[in-house]
Amino acid sequence: MVASNSVAVGCAVGIPVGVGLIIAGCFWLRLQRRFKREDEQDADLQRAVFDEDAYINFESMPTLRNNNNNDEDNNDDKRIKKIEENGNENTIPINDNKEQRKSKYFVPAYRRKINALSVRYDGQQNIEMQGFGANSSKVSLDSSNAPPKRVISVYDQMVPFVDGDKNSVIQNTELLESNDSVGNDSTRPSSQANLISNLNSNDFGSYYPRKESFSSINIPHLNTSSPSFTTRPSSVNSMIRPNSTDNIFDTPRKSNSDIVSINKDQVNRTGSPVKGTVISENMGYKLKNNYNIENSNEIAEEDQYENEFTNYSQNKKEFIDSLRPK
């Protein structure tokens, strides 16, 4: 009786656990197989990108092809046959309907783009081989007269070319359009020379022209220089001073008493006060600071910014006095 109970409990617990482990193992193996396949695809693509001197040969990368997608292969064959009938290499439709793009697995966007490039490359090779077999003599003569076809590197496929014309507007094109224009243009100069010429023709150090304001549109621009700062208007004593040009940043070398004495001498000489002059103690420019103007020769350096409005010591004293309780 005890043995039958233990067997029943073991079967009830062990069988579901065993089935779950088997199912989990199957999913794990499938996931590992998928990871391995994706690692191989990424390694092939990275190897092709880092090869600078070789064209991306999709025949050497079978992992990039989706063998499980039979509908896509049939669509590619139809596309190539249509190209052969039309005889135009640039009429390859890239975008397909959703019904024609059904796949068993999810394909990323960059791999769909690579597959489209591989289809275009295969179609071009088939057309070239058929043209060579149909009229080989004409092809040989044309190839001898034509310039040598340049070798397309990986950078030519990945990096789009910039138009060398300065006046033309640079338009952003997709990777497929740039690859198509680069791969089909055999008479174009080498990529290195074209890149150098484009870099030399572009002006990277200039700025866009400044937009004129509405107030200055109808006003003629005069070629006159404007002063960097506006000085004070000449004071009453400008005609008495030896230098009429006032320098507001210069330390005055004359005291107020000297200016008053000059005004008195002017009055005594003429017998009447000069027109526009007033004898007062407010005449002239007086620098009120902590230094004495009369001993200016003994002062090594004066604080030009400490005057009657910015008397730091006086303001500090008044501020401290205002904090005291009254």
Curated annotation (Swiss-Prot):
Membrane-protein topology: Single-pass type III membrane protein
State whether keyword Transit peptide applies.
no
Q: Which UniProt keywords apply?
A: Cell membrane, Cell wall biogenesis/degradation, Membrane, Signal-anchor, Transmembrane, Transmembrane helix
Kindly report every residue range on the membrane side named Extracellular: 1-8
State if Cell wall biogenesis/degradation is listed as a keyword.
yes
Task: List this protein's GO terms for biological process.
Answer: fungal-type cell wall organization
Q: Which GO terms describe its cellular component?
A: cellular bud membrane; cellular bud tip; incipient cellular bud site
Segments traversing the membrane: 9-29
Chief localization:
membrane
Which superkingdom?
Answer: Eukaryota
Q: Where is the signal peptide?
A: none
Those parts of the protein on the Cytoplasmic side are 30-326
Q: Where is this region: Disordered?
A: 177-199
Location relative to the cell: Cell membrane; Bud membrane
**Tell me, what does this protein do in biology?**
Plays a role in cell wall integrity. Affects the cell wall polymer composition in the growing region of the cell.
Which protein family is it in?
Answer: Belongs to the SKG1 family.
State the name under which the record lists this protein: Suppressor of lethality of KEX2 GAS1 double null mutant protein 1
